[in-house]
Design a protein with these regions (language model features):
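Sec/Tat-exported extracytoplasmic proteins
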Residues: 45-49, 113-117, 139, 143
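M16 family metallopeptidases and their MPP-like homologs
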Residues: 12, 18-31, 36, 58-111, ...
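Short, polar/flexible loop-turn hinges at active-site or ligand-entry regions and domain interfaces
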Residues: 48-51, 93-96, 115-124
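Acidic/histidine-enriched alpha-helical segments
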Residues: 59, 115-139
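Short amphipathic C-terminal alpha-helix that caps PH/PH-like domains
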Residues: 41, 105-113, 210
């Protein structure tokens, strides 16, 4: 179901799981100029927002939503760079209150995307430096993994495109060069302009996915709270 031009909602019906999942996926052309900004933006999204301005506040709120799990992921697929924001939460049939949790999760999705913690036209500097250090430490740990190291070396032999050959040292330097302002600018750019591929994926359990019921669900669950603008063709 299309929310606006270029942004669609995809419903996947399944009875296999005890949880529901909502995933927002941004797809951008792979670029050396934005790869570090995308990675740091993804890290910042799951750290805090204006309603929950510290990591502790956000984790406490997630715990109050019956242990909802929130995660981000940033990865390459072909010549595209993909940023994902995922929420996994318990199905209604296991709760005493019905038809409440999904709306609360969607409000949190909205806050996460449209109300990050911003200081002087950039991400909060203190939070940003913490996330940058953690990202660099994670990359360094990956390079100590022999399988990951071998995979990166194989990339250098297999690909001719420098975007796909990206070495650890180059990526590390690009991350070090990022500032709260440059990463926030990158975040605003992909939020406004990048295409949405499978942008909102809702894994539905015990829900009949007909056109009428999907339309009703979109209205009830407040998907219209997202202020998305149309993408160009």
């Amino acid at each position: 179901m299309e929310l606006v031009h270029g942004i669609s909602t995809h419903f996947i019906q399944s009875k296999k799981f005890k949880t529901n999942k909502i995933t927002v996926r941004f797809t951008a052309p792979l670029s050396l100029d934005t790869i570090a900004g995308h990675m740091l933006s993804a890290s910042m999204l799951e750290t805090a927002n204006q309603m929950y301005p510290t990591s502790q506040d956000l984790r406490r709120h997630l715990a109050s939503l019956y242990g909802t799990d929130m995660s981000t992921n940033c990865f390459r697929r072909g010549q595209s760079h993909i940023i994902e924001l995922t929420f996994t939460y318990v199905r209604d049939e296991f709760l005493s209150r019905k038809n409440v949790l999904t709306s609360q999760i969607l409000e949190l999705v909205k806050e996460t995307l449209f109300s990050p913690v911003v200081v002087d036209n950039g991400f909060d500097p203190a939070l940003f430096e913490i996330e940058k250090k953690q990202l660099l430490a994670s990359l360094a740990a990956d390079m100590d993994d022999s399988f990951y190291f071998a995979h990166k070396e194989l990339d250098k032999l297999f690909f001719h495109d420098e975007r796909l050959q990206l070495e650890y040292s180059d990526l590390r330097n690009r991350i070090l060069a990022e500032t709260p302002q440059s990463s926030y600018s990158c975040f605003q750019e992909f939020l406004a302009n990048d295409s949405f591929s499978n942008d909102v994926v809702y894994v539905v359990n015990s829900f009949l996915c007909t056109k009428t019921t999907v339309t009703r669900f979109v209205t009830v669950a407040k998907f219209n709270c997202f202020v998305f603008t149309s993408r160009s063709s």
